[in-house]
UniProtKB/Swiss-Prot annotation:
Main location: cytoplasm
Highest taxon, organism lineage: Bacteria
Family: Belongs to the DsrF/TusC family.
Organism: Salmonella arizonae (strain ATCC BAA-731 / CDC346-86 / RSK2980)
UniProt keyword list: Cytoplasm, tRNA processing
Biological processes, Gene Ontology terms: tRNA processing
InterPro entries from the UniProt entry: DsrEFH-like, Sulphur_relay_DsrE/F-like, Sulphur_relay_TusC, Sulphur_relay_TusC/DsrF
Protein name: Protein TusC
């Protein structure tokens, strides 16, 4: 079975990319357990709690990330450099994601056969 990586690299609510990626991830999790989820660049904002998407007339899909345990999605990484660049430290993200430096993150991403970016 091929290993599939989902890479979230865009900020939430500015486009449908994050929501569509999350939908694809949850659907794919029904077919395979060989999944990895990566949050890089502005994608780290996908995991911030307390967002108010209704202010920009967007759907609140961020809470759906909390379903990862229910879907047995436990391989999650977040780019430590992206967190530093955006001043995000000591934040309780909506998902438990392991911070990795860029080199280690690329190495981990190299273990996947298919990479889908949202």
């Amino acid at each position: 079975m091929k290993r599939i990586a989902f890479v979230f690299s865009t900020a939430p609510h500015g486009s449908a990319s994050g929501r569509e990626g999350l939908d694809a991830l949850l659907a794919t999790s029904a077919l395979t357990e060989a999944l990895g989820v990566f949050f890089i660049s502005d994608g780290v904002f996908q995991l911030l709690p307390g967002q108010k998407p209704d202010a920009v007339l967007a759907r609140d899909y961020i809470a759906t990330f909390k379903l990862f345990d229910l879907y047995d999605i436990d391989q999650c990484w977040i780019c430590a450099a992206s967190l530093r660049e955006r001043g995000l430290k000591n934040v309780n993200f909506v998902v438990d994601a392991t911070p990795l430096e860029p080199v280690a993150l690329r190495r981990e991403l190299g273990n996947y056969d298919v990479i889908l970016r949202f």
